[in-house]
């Protein structure tokens, strides 16, 4: 009763501004202090600045007189909001009076109307929140692009229209109505400006706005009037408030507004879908249809998701929504089957129509129902697409057809018909996103599970397993299928274990147990079928995969009937020209299956009798298959002959080979031409002929074998191995001369390096056969072999030739052959060849005879090998007592040996000088060493030395000292310093100065004396001078 009296007392304060207060009706509106200003305005009413100044002063006085607000609001303050105090109510009346008199003078002043309406709003709507003030401040700073972006405007409308306080809509209804009426007057005076419209429409978003204005038709008509009045460039600002109002109001009215906008701009569809699902009363059917619509548009590049989602992601969102609200979105199983039957009937009717008779005019056919998607809703009832006229403005030069999809009930949110989820997933999902079939099939099955259609879900899983073509999709479906089966079994077991269910009369325990048994049996069968299902997936992906067919056959194990069925299906399915891998093993294994009597029992015995006739039929069929390669066809014939041999049908095997190797009249067929059937190229298959020759060698006669080999060589398909086999066969049968002729024929057919292998075998066989009996013939053969032999291959032939001469000929001729070999072989073999030559010359003629060989070796060998040969040469001279010659050879070799890389050489020379030399020779060796080191002391040589030392595993060389570098740069100055130091030592020892006689001999770049051995102090007076002829 107290609350009623409070409301009545508060309601009595209103209306405040209706009718408009005037000084006549409300004398307190003009205090005595304001009379001068009022008189001034009466005399000069057209001065807008005076009016605004007067209003500003009045607002300041009202604000100063306003009492301070406490922390806790009283009931009056909660209901009346800003108008809770008498000072505020009087101030409102006073301001309204002044504003109304000013507007009467300036009815089209935008500045005056805006200030007036904002003032009225502040007393009715309350105060904006801090977030709303900040949002409006940020919006004011944005550019012109923001004013046309409806998405940002919609978000801004939600942020910028939040208030605290406000006048109660019941108590202050009269004041709310007066505010709305004032807004109507403002937009009538300023109809073409957007701000007045936005201020007026913003009132309708206030949470305390009376429902008669907010939820009724008034708000919708006000927004529509704004869209009709303002130019299209400003419609975005209106739509931002309009859509926000539609979200606040909700219901059918709000949904109709959203549908109107989304027809023009579908970019906000995802936001609207979120709103539909998060509303107090979710509308999943409409949301699903919206999702399906944008998924289809995105797939046709007619829609771009603001959230960056792909068409597939949008369709998955639709599928997830269907899974979540299965009962509210999709049809039941009966409805789905009925719709499928209708579609099939329509398709059969269209396919069964008779073709038009020639000369008869075609009659227009009646447009079918919307099942085939041929209808488009333009306005009113559905009309055929062909009857929809293209709208063309009067002033337009041309018009284009709108890029929109034809009308479909599945994408019309206003249509209450439930969706055919199964058909949609098959048409829009599985046929479009074939690489994501696993997710789509499991989603469809989950939909049926959520609806309780477990049999339909099981059938869906089975269809998915039978349709996917990737292991990933198969695994996804199979795991979901197994999980569903386990869940069903667990649920049935829990139901049987629940005692409450046993006491329930409606619970049929026997039926539940029977269903549980069936489920468990199906689950076991599913697990057993997994290898076969995986194999099916791989074969669907590539039915020409031979290996997978072999795995399929192996999976059947001992089931002979299934094995035969798998073989037959594989051979009927595989395209021989597209087979992956060799195809012939399938035919061979199939024939062996019959040959061996099928699978074997536990004792290893065949379960059936061998069936050679059936095996021969399979081989016969295989010989007519157009394989990709001739070798596969050759393998078939060889395996067929092998089967006959295993069954001791030797004559039949020979006949098969004769049949397979039949030579046609036209032998100029290109063996490598894949356009020619392999059967026509089979006679040139070396594999087939090789098997035939081996077969003849085993069970045939010598003459028949020779005939086969001769035919191979006649067809010019023989290789080196065939030549060797043929010659070896003749040799084993004591046809030695014929075997040698075969070698010669092979040499004529082939060039090096293949001819080298034949020569190598031929010569070794010839020498082994005749030895020294036919020496001249053997020499001719060797000369013939070496005549065109490349230097890369001639070394073994020279060695064999020389060995022949050593064993059966003359040593002098052998030395000549070694000499020829040393100058003929390639550079990498010369060092070894000279080593052999020197060893043979030493053995036959002694050490002195090797001097000219060494000299020729030093001229022809590379630097590195020359150094090694010099060391050997020097050792030989030292053995002969020729010390000076050995020293000269060391000096010659020094130019090739970097001390940092070849320390062994210098150590050997050092030891030589210590053992056989003098102080002068030792000093000369040191001088040469420094000169050589100087010649190698360059950046490139140093890097090469480092690399060579690293490859040898020794310590890396380091740079010489400054003094050594200086000495290397000036070898003569270094020698003078050394001699001066030696003289000083002698003076200290002998007490008198010592002088060293100098000699002026010519030296080369490395400091080696180029004078004769007889000149200078370093000459050996006992040296023996010999000419080359005396060797």
Swiss-Prot record:
Gene Ontology, cellular component aspect: post-mRNA release spliceosomal complex; Prp19 complex; U2-type catalytic step 2 spliceosome
Pfam families documented for this protein: HAT_Syf1_CNRKL1_C (PF23231), HAT_Syf1_CNRKL1_N (PF23233), HAT_Syf1_M (PF23220)
Biological process per Gene Ontology, one example term: generation of catalytic spliceosome for first transesterification step
Membrane spanning stretches: none
Renumbered residue ranges of the record's region Disordered: 346-368, 948-969, 1003-1031
Keyword terms of this UniProt record: mRNA processing, mRNA splicing, Nucleus, Repeat, Spliceosome
Biased composition (Low complexity): 353-368
Localization (cell): Nucleus
InterPro entries on file: HAT, HAT_Syf1-like_N, HAT_Syf1_central, HAT_Syf1_CNRKL1_C, Syf1-like, TPR-like_helical_dom_sf, TPR_rpt
HAT repeat positions: 28-60, 90-122, 214-248, 250-269, 452-487, 610-646, 664-698, 700-732, 734-768, 773-807, 845-879, 881-915
Primary localisation category: nucleus
Subunit composition and interactions: Associated with the spliceosome.
Family to which the UniProt record says this protein belongs: Belongs to the crooked-neck family.
Function of the protein: Involved in pre-mRNA splicing and cell cycle progression.
Protein name in UniProt: Pre-mRNA-splicing factor SYF1
Native source species: Cryptococcus neoformans var. neoformans serotype D (strain JEC21 / ATCC MYA-565) (Filobasidiella neoformans)
């Amino acid at each position: 009763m107290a609350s009623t009296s409070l409301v009545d007392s508060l309601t009595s304060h209103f209306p405040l501004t209706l009718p408009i207060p005037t000084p006549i009706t409300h004398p307190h509106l003009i205090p005595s202090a304001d009379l001068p200003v009022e008189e001034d305005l009466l005399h000069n009413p057209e001065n807008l600045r005076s009016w605004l100044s007067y209003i500003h002063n009045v607002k300041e006085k009202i604000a100063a007189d306003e009492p301070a607000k406490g922390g806790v609001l009283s009931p009056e303050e909660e209901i009346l909001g800003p108008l809770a105090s008498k000072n505020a109510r009087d101030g409102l009346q006073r301001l309204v009076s002044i504003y109304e008199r000013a507007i009467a003078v300036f009815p089209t002043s935008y500045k005056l109307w805006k200030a007036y309406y904002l003032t009225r709003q502040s007393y009715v709507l309350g105060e904006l929140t801090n977030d709303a003030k900040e949002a409006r401040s940020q919006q004011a700073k944005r550019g012109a692009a923001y004013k046309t972006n409806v998405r940002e405007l919609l978000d801004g409308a939600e942020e910028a229209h939040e208030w605290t306080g406000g006048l109660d809509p019941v108590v202050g209804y009269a004041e709310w109505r007066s505010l709305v009426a004032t807004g109507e007057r403002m937009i009538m005076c300023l109809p073409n400006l957007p701000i007045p419209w936005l201020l007026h429409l913003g009132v309708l978003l206030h949470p305390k706005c009376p429902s008669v204005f907010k939820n009724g038709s008034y708000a919708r008509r006000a927004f529509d009037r704004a869209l009709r009045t303002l130019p299209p460039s400003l419609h975005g600002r209106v739509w931002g408030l309009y859509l926000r109002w539609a979200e606040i109001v909700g219901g059918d009215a709000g949904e109709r507004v959203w549908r109107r906008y989304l027809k023009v701009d579908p970019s906000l569809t995802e936001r609207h879908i979120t709103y539909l699902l998060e509303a107090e009363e979710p509308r999943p059917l409409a949301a699903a249809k919206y999702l399906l619509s944008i998924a289809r548009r995105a797939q046709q590049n007619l829609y771009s998701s603001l959230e960056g989602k792909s068409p597939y992601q949008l369709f998955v969102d639709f599928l997830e929504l269907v899974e979540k609200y299965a009962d509210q979105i999709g049809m039941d199983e009966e409805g789905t089957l009925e719709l499928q039957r209708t579609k099939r009937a329509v398709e059969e009717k269209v396919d069964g129509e008779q073709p038009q008779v020639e000369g008869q005019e075609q009659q227009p056919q009646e447009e079918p129902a919307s099942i085939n998607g041929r209808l488009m809703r333009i306005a009113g009832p559905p009309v055929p697409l062909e009857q929809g006229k293209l709208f063309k403005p009067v002033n337009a030069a041309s018009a284009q057809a709108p890029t929109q999809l034809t009308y479909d009930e599945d994408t019309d949110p206003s249509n209450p018909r439930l969706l055919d989820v199964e058909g949609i997933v098959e048409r829009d999902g599985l046929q479009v996103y074939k690489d994501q079939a696993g997710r789509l099939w499991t989603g469809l099955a989950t939909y049926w599970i959520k609806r309780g259609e477990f049999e339909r879900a099981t059938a869906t899983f089975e269809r998915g397993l039978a349709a996917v073509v990737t292991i990933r999709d198969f695994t996804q479906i199979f795991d979901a299928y197994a999980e569903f089966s386990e869940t069903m079994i667990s649920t049935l077991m829990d139901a049987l274990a629940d005692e409450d269910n046993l006491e329930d009369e409606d619970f049929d325990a026997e039926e539940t147990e029977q269903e549980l048994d069936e489920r468990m049996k199906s689950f076991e069968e599913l697990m057993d079928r997994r290898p076969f299902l995986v194999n099916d997936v791989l074969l669907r992906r590539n039915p020409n995969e031979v290996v997978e067919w072999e795995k399929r056959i192996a999976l059947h194990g001992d089931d002979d009937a299934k094995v035969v069925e798998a073989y037959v299906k594989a051979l009927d399915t595989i395209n021989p020209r597209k087979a992956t891998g060799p195809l012939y093993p399938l035919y061979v294994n199939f024939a062996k299956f019959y040959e061996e009597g099928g699978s074997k029992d536990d004792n290893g015995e065949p379960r059936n009798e061998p069936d050679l006739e059936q095996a021969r039929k399979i081989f016969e069929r295989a010989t007519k298959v157009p394989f990709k390669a001739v070798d596969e066809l050759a393998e078939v014939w060889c395996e067929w002959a092998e089967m006959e041999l295993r069954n001791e049908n030797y004559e039949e095997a020979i006949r098969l080979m004769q049949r397979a190797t039949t030579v046609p009249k036209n032998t100029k067929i290109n063996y490598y031409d894949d356009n020619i059937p392999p059967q026509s190229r089979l006679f040139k298959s070396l594999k087939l002929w090789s098997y035939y020759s081996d077969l003849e060698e085993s069970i045939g006669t010598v003459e028949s074998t020779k005939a086969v080999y001769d035919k191979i060589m006649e067809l010019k398909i023989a290789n080196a191995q065939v030549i060797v086999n043929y010659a070896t066969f003749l040799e084993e049968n004591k046809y030695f001369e014929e075997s040698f002729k075969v070698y010669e024929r092979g040499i004529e057919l082939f060039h090096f390096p293949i001819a080298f292998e034949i020569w190598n075998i031929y010569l070794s066989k010839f020498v082994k056969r005749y030895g020294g009996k036919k020496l001249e013939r053997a020499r001719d053969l060797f000369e013939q072999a070496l005549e065109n032999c490349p230097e890369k291959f001639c070394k073994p032939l020279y060695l064999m030739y020389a060995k022949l001469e050593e064993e059966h000929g003359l040593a002098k001729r052998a030395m000549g052959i070694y000499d020829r070999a040393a100058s003929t072989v390639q550079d990498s073999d010369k060092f070894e060849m000279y080593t052999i030559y020197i060893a043979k010359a030493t053995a036959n003629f002694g050490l002195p005879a090797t001097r000219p060989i060494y000299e020729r070796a030093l001229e022809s060998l590379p630097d590195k090998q020359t150094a090694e040969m010099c060391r050997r040469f020097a050792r030989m001279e030292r053995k002969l007592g020729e010390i000076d010659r050995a020293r000269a050879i060391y000096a010659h070799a020094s130019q090739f040996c970097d001390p940092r890389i070849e320390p062994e050489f210098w150590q050997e020379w050092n030891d030589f000088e210590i053992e056989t030399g003098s102080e002068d020779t030792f000093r000369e060796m040191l001088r040469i060493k420094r000169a050589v080191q100087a010649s190698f002391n360059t950046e490139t040589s140093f890097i090469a030395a480092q690399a060579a030392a690293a490859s040898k595993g020794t310590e890396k060389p380091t740079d010489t000292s400054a003094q050594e570098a200086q000495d290397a740069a000036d070898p003569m100055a270094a020698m003078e310093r050394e001699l001066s130091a030696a003289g000083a030592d002698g003076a200290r020892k002998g007490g008198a100065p010592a002088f060293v006689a100098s000699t002026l001999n010519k030296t080369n770049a490395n400091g080696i004396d180029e004078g004769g051995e007889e000149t200078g102090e370093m000459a050996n007076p006992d040296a023996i001078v010999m000419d080359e002829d005396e060797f």
